[in-house]
Amino acid sequence: MGRNANTNTTKNYGKEKDDFIEFDYSSGANAAHGRIYLDNETSKDTYSIVPISLSLNGLAIKGCRVYIPRGNDEKGPGIMFPAFKNNSGEYIPYMYMYEKDDIAFLKELAQHIADKCK
């Protein structure tokens, strides 16, 4: 069985304290993969998100996290980006560097991860 580059997979692993979900998500030229660790020591509705490996149009970005809201949050889940310091000393989120297609992919990715964490 051949592997389709656009196949999105999620695997669940259970090890009591170190439960995590491993994901591999792609759409077109964009791809993301990594692990989401489930925090068993607080609330079952609380998720501890490790930085995910993210690649957009071949550009690798480290330090991203996924925001998964609890309760009714109109914004829904989202990707939290690290910031970089520009020449003026201001911190600017990487989010402002991306095209509309990339933003759409990031929204899909965040929703995919949120759905898998339910």
Where do the language-model regions lie?
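Single-stranded nucleic acid-binding surfaces, predominantly the OB-fold ssDNA-binding core
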Residues: G2-K118
